[in-house]
Design a protein with these regions (language model features):
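Conserved beta-strand scaffold positions in the cores of enzyme catalytic domains, especially
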Residues: 70-71, 114, 147-149, 158
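Ligand-binding beta-strand-loop-alpha-helix segment within the catalytic cores
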Residues: 151-181
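Structural signal for conserved beta-strand scaffold positions within catalytic alpha/beta enzyme cores
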Residues: 55, 73, 149-152, 160
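Contiguous, glycine/small-aliphatic-enriched amphipathic segments in soluble metabolic enzymes
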Residues: 1-134, 177-234
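Short, flexible loop segments at boundaries between secondary-structure elements
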Residues: 140-156
Length: 234
């Protein structure tokens, strides 16, 4: 698995180092971190973790020993000094480069999947990458015409109709087309990724009590229910 560092000024390097310090994840996969080699070195040292940070080059994905943390650093030059916890174009550009490299490795078949540490949305926009999040950026890099964000936890598999928008803007963004698309993508994902032959997809309401016949909003009757019925008919 390729694990992108996320924003070097953020929590990503620490989360990655702590996660890979244990044996549980290494029993499940062969991890390789795609990010800044000096930042990972400094992070491991500051946390007093008993791991050797090693650099791997190019498309090399040989599994490291249990006490090694393998890092593929695609940066042309070290990041140098930067403020922690602050959005800057410098670290924003680096985090985007890490994602692009991970996509390249996945498309070449060098890694089987990508795990992403947090990016800073403000920082990537400061760097000229005008995407609201990982989902939209990954769709663009892979030329994927239809995409959606699904979160998985235990028995729950939740597909979003909208992503990365302010709550106040949400009602105006809900359309029958978008809802039908989310239902269709959820159905396909449950079949193809989770092996569920006959998935059951539930559609959540927007308003309290599903609008209570218009007392608390009409999006359910006007948009959500027609989209649900259209999807059922397909």
């Amino acid at each position: 698995l390729g694990i992108t560092m996320g924003d070097p000024a953020g929590i990503g390097p620490e989360v990655i180092a702590k996660a890979l310090a244990g044996k549980a994840l290494r029993r499940l996969c062969r991890p390789i971190v795609i990010g800044s080699f000096p930042v990972m070195q400094q992070t491991v040292k500051s946390l007093n973790l008993h791991m050797n940070v090693i650099r791997v080059e190019g498309q090399e994905t040989a599994p490291p020993r249990s006490n090694q943390l393998a890092v593929l650093d695609p940066l042309d030059r070290p990041l140098g000094r930067f403020p922690r916890g602050v959005a800057t174009p410098q670290t924003g550009a680096a985090s985007v480069l890490f994602i692009k490299k991970a996509v390249e490795l996945a498309q070449l078949g060098c890694i089987d999947g990508i795990v992403t540490a947090p990016i800073n949305k403000e920082a990537i926009n400061l760097a000229g990458c005008h995407f609201p999040g990982h989902t939209e950026l990954l769709a663009d890099l892979t030329a994927t015409p239809e995409s959606g964000m699904m979160i998985v936890g235990g028995p729950l598999r939740i597909m979003f109709v909208t992503t990365h928008v302010a709550i106040k803007d949400l009602p105006a963004l809900l359309t029958q087309t978008k809802i039908e698309k989310a239902i269709r993508l959820a159905h396909l994902a449950l079949q193809d990724l989770f092996g569920i032959k006959k998935p059951r997809v539930g559609v959540a309401a927007l308003n309290p009590h599903a609008g209570e016949h218009g007392l608390f909003g009409d999006e359910e009757a006007r948009v959500i229910l027609p989209a649900t019925r259209a999807a059922q008919a397909q």
